[in-house]
C-alpha cells in the first residue's frame, strides 16, 4: 500500500502557490485494507475515505469507463491492481495529473511540469471528452492562471460541443463551475475560452449574441458590445467585487443584442430590453436569488444610475423606491459598484471617475433624514392616515432637491471648463 499526494496540491506546490486542499490516492489497497487501518468511508460514488487523524481525503486508485452521455454516466474500477499511472490518466489536464510520493519526488507521466512552465492547458487523454464538465473546468483554469489552451485540446472541446455533450450539462454543475470561474483573477478569459470552443453559444447564448453588435465609438472606443461586456466583467474582478456583482456585470448589457438594426450603433432602451434575457439566464442557470436579483436590477437601472445628473428630484425619489433602496441599501450600493465597472470597462477609459455613485448614496442618505415614523404618527393623530405616504414623499423630496441642485450646478461648472 502506497500513498501519493495528487492533483491540485501538487500543481499549486510547483507553481509556488499556497496549497489549500490536499487529496491523496492510495495504490495497492482495497476498501477492506482502508477500513482495517481506521479510515472512514465517505464516498457515495467513489471509494473515498477520511484519514483517522488528519481527516484528509484518501481515494483508492481507480479507472473509469464512460457508460452514458453527460457527466454522470460513468462506471469505475477500484482495486489493488490499479496503478498510479492508470489513476492519473483518467484526470482532465496534464497539470492536474501529477503526484508526489512520500520522499517528495514528483511523478509526472504526462508532461504536467512542462505544460506548467509553458503556461499550457492540455488534456491527458481522449477520455477528456467523456465528461462535459471538463469544458467548464478548463475555461475556469484558464481564468485562474491565464494559461493558453493547447490547440488539440480546444479542438477536442469544439468537437464535444458539436456532439451535443454541452447540452447534457445540468444547471447545478454549470453554475458551480461558472461561479468559481467568475471569482477567478481573470474571469474574462473564461468567457473567451467558452466562446472559442462554441460552448458559450450553448450555455449563454444571450451573452454570445453581444459579440459583433456595434456601439457608438464616442462612448465605446472598443465598439463591440461583447468586448465591452468582457471589459466590464474584468474591471469588476480587478475591483475585487463579489460574485453577485461580477455576475451582474456580465449580464448588464444583454439588451444590446435586441437593438433593432436600423438604429445601431445607438441602443435606446437596451436597459429595459435586457430584463427578459437576464431572467432567462437566471432561470437556465438556476442562479442563486441574490445573484439573480442584482443582475436584473443592474440591467434595468444602470442607464438611469449613469444619468443621475439629468434627473428631476421626483424621478430620483421614484428610482430609490422602485429599486428598494430604502429597505435594501446594501444591494443598492452593490448595483452602483457594477456601474463603476461598466463605466470603466471601456477601451482607454479604465480610470474614468464615477461621481454618480457617491451622489446616489448621498441622495439616499438625505432622503432617509425625513423622519417617516414621526410623519406617520402626526398624520394618524390628525386623522389623516391616508396621507402618510404622500407626506413622507414630500419630506424626502425636500431633502433631495437641494442636493440634486448642487450636483447639477457642479456638473455644469465642470463641463464649461
Curated annotation (Swiss-Prot):
Spell out the Pfam families in the cross-references.
HD, PolyA_pol, PolyA_pol_RNAbd
Q: Where does CTP bind?
A: 8, 11, 91, 137, 140
By its UniProt entry, which CDD domains does this protein fall under? Answer: HDc, NT_ClassII-CCAase
Sites binding Mg(2+) sit at 21, 23
EC number(s) stated in the UniProt entry for this protein: 2.7.7.72, 3.1.3.-, 3.1.4.-
* Keyword vocabulary terms for this entry: ATP-binding, Hydrolase, Magnesium, Metal-binding, Multifunctional enzyme, Nickel, Nucleotide-binding, Nucleotidyltransferase, RNA repair, RNA-binding, Transferase, tRNA processing
Q: What else is known?
A: A single active site specifically recognizes both ATP and CTP and is responsible for their addition.
Its annotated function is as follows: Catalyzes the addition and repair of the essential 3'-terminal CCA sequence in tRNAs without using a nucleic acid template. Adds these three nucleotides in the order of C, C, and A to the tRNA nucleotide-73, using CTP and ATP as substrates and producing inorganic pyrophosphate. tRNA 3'-terminal CCA addition is required both for tRNA processing and repair. Also involved in tRNA surveillance by mediating tandem CCA addition to generate a CCACCA at the 3' terminus of unstable tRNAs. While stable tRNAs receive only 3'-terminal CCA, unstable tRNAs are marked with CCACCA and rapidly degraded.
Q: What is this protein called?
A: Multifunctional CCA protein
Protein's organism: Neisseria meningitidis serogroup A / serotype 4A (strain DSM 15465 / Z2491)
Which lineage is the organism of this entry classified under, starting from the top rank? Answer: Bacteria, Pseudomonadati, Pseudomonadota, Betaproteobacteria, Neisseriales
Amino acid at each position: 500500500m502506497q500513498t501519493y499526494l495528487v492533483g491540485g496540491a501538487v500543481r499549486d506546490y510547483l507553481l509556488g502557490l499556497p496549497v489549500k486542499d490536499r487529496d491523496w490516492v492510495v495504490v495497492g489497497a482495497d476498501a477492506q485494507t482502508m477500513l482495517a487501518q481506521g479510515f472512514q468511508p465517505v464516498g457515495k460514488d467513489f471509494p473515498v475515505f477520511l484519514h483517522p487523524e488528519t481527516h484528509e481525503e484518501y481515494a483508492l486508485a481507480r479507472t473509469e469507463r464512460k457508460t452514458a452521455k453527460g457527466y454522470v454516466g460513468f462506471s469505475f474500477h477500484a482495486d489493488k491492481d490499479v496503478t498510479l499511472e492508470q489513476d492519473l490518466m483518467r484526470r482532465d489536464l496534464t497539470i492536474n495529473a501529477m503526484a508526489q510520493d512520500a520522499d517528495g519526488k514528483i511523478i509526472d507521466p504526462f508532461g504536467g511540469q512542462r505544460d506548467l512552465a509553458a503556461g499550457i492547458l492540455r488534456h491527458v487523454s481522449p477520455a477528456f471528452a467523456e465528461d462535459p464538465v471538463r469544458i467548464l473546468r478548463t475555461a475556469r483554469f484558464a481564468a485562474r492562471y491565464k494559461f493558453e489552451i493547447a490547440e488539440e485540446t480546444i479542438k477536442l472541446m469544439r468537437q464535444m460541443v458539436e456532439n451535443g455533450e454541452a447540452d447534457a450539462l445540468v444547471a447545478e454543475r454549470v453554475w458551480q463551475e461558472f461561479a468559481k470561474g467568475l471569482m477567478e483573477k481573470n474571469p474574462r478569459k473564461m468567457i473567451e475560452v467558452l466562446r472559442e470552443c462554441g460552448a458559450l453559444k450553448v450555455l449563454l447564448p444571450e451573452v454570445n449574441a453581444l459579440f459583433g453588435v456595434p456601439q457608438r465609438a464616442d462612448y465605446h472606443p472598443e465598439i463591440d458590445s461583447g468586448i465591452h461586456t468582457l471589459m466590464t466583467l474584468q474591471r469588476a474582478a480587478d475591483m475585487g467585487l463579489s460574485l453577485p456583482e461580477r455576475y451582474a456585470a456580465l449580464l448588464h448589457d444583454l439588451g444590446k443584442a435586441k437593438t433593432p438594426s436600423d438604429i445601431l450603433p445607438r441602443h435606446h432602451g437596451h436597459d429595459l430590453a435586457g430584463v427578459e434575457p437576464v431572467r432567462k439566464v437566471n432561470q437556465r442557470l438556476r442562479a442563486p436569488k441574490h445573484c439573480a436579483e442584482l443582475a436584473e436590477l443592474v440591467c434595468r437601472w444602470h442607464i438611469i444610475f449613469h444619468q443621475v445628473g439629468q434627473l428631476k428630484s421626483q424621478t430620483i425619489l421614484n428610482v430609490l423606491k422602485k429599486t428598494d433602496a430604502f429597505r435594501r441599501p446594501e444591494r443598492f450600493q452593490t448595483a452602483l459598484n457594477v456601474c463603476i465597472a461598466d463605466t470603466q470597462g471601456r477601451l482607454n477609459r479604465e480610470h474614468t471617475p464615477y461621481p454618480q455613485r457617491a451622489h446616489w448614496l448621498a441622495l439616499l442618505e438625505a432622503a432617509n433624514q425625513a423622519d417617516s415614523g414621526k410623519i406617520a404618527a402626526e398624520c394618524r393623530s390628525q386623522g389623516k392616515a391616508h396621507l402618510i405616504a404622500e407626506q413622507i414623499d414630500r419630506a424626502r423630496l425636500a431633502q433631495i432637491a437641494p442636493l440634486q441642485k448642487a450636483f447639477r450646478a457642479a456638473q455644469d461648472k465642470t463641463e464649461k471648463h
